[in-house]
Design a protein with these regions (language model features):
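Glycine-anchored, exposed beta-strand/edge motif detector
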Residues: 2-143
């Protein structure tokens, strides 16, 4: 078993370094940073991911994660189970703390619940240059 030294553990301010998962982009298109993804399969020891959307059960089921950085098409990158996402437009929410849902637009979130309501986090601020906390853990289906 490996030995993890305390000095190598970084504090988690907007995400936790220790929870990052190395994945393979299953598509030939780049997945941009802060886009929401779902696990679509595996290749060797790596999970394969695609952009998630609320248009079909197939593209929004299971644990959702968020891209830490741009992941090149057919390349490798890191996804996170939670992250504080800043510099995004959250002006569509009524107030800070409002729930956010997976959008029918691949990889995005929306303040208006679509037909398939998949909860992905909540707004921290309601502004054109706002922030939200992504948390794709467990069953994301809103009731």
């Amino acid at each position: 078993m490996g030995n993890l030294k305390q000095r190598l553990i970084k504090p988690g301010t907007d995400f936790n370094y220790a929870e990052g998962v190395k994945v393979k982009n299953a598509s030939s298109s780049t997945i941009s940073a802060n886009k929401i993804v779902y696990v679509s399969g595996y290749e060797g020891p790596f999970l394969k991911v695609n952009l998630a959307d609320a248009s079909s059960d197939n593209t929004c089921s299971g644990r959702l994660m968020i891209a830490k950085h741009d992941i090149p098409g057919d390349g490798f990158g890191v996804v996170l189970p939670w992250k504080l996402v800043t510099s995004v437009d959250t002006s569509g929410v009524t107030a800070a703390g409002d729930p956010l849902y997976l959008s029918e637009t691949a990889g995005d979130f929306t303040a208006t619940a679509p037909t398939l309501k998949v909860y992905v986090g909540h707004a921290i601020t309601d502004a054109a240059d706002g922030a939200y906390l992504f948390c794709g853990e467990g069953s994301n289906r809103a009731v």
